[in-house]
Amino acid sequence: MTPLDVMWVCLGGGVGSLGRWWIGRIVGEYHHGAFPLGTFLINISGAFVIGYLSVLFGVDWHDRYGTMLNAGVLTGILGGYTTFSSMQLDAVKLSHKGQGGLAVFYLVASVLSGLFAAWLGAMLAHLQG
């Protein structure tokens, strides 16, 4: 890890976090239901993009931190954009509000939809490749 890698991850993380905040606010203005739609959409779209770009960039698990493109985009932007911890917090909040069934549905739907979105992104990149 070099100081330049750290800089790219920090810059990318800031951009991704701002994107998550902006999209979350927009979704929150229009969706007022119990289901945490903003976090769900952010995580699913992020999974799609990381699946797509990982194939497009030819990134394997062991080398995803190595280059400016990988560090800045995959780890930085998409790491800042997606939010596993907010998904967990949303589920805990739903459970504390007596909506345990919705919390379980949210977690299962998030994981399965995220896996499908990442797979779909990877397949699209392979088709274009």
From Swiss-Prot:
Membrane topology term reads: Multi-pass membrane protein
Q: Which InterPro entries match?
A: FluC
Where on the tree of life does the source sit, at the highest rank? Bacteria
Provide the residue positions that the database annotates as binding Na(+).
79, 82
- Reactions catalysed, as given in the entry: fluoride(in) = fluoride(out)
Q: What is its main location?
A: membrane
Q: Name one GO cellular component term.
A: plasma membrane
Question: What are the TM regions of this chain, as residue ranges?
Answer: 4-24, 39-59, 65-85, 104-124
Query: Which is one Pfam family of this protein?
Result: CRCB
Alphabetic keyword roster: Cell inner membrane, Cell membrane, Ion channel, Ion transport, Membrane, Metal-binding, Sodium, Transmembrane, Transmembrane helix, Transport
Q: How is its activity regulated?
A: Na(+) is not transported, but it plays an essential structural role and its presence is essential for fluoride channel function.
**Keyword Protein biosynthesis in record:** no
From the record, give the cysteines joined by S-S bonds: none
As for family, the record states: Belongs to the fluoride channel Fluc/FEX (TC 1.A.43) family.
Name of the protein this chain belongs to: Fluoride-specific ion channel FluC 2
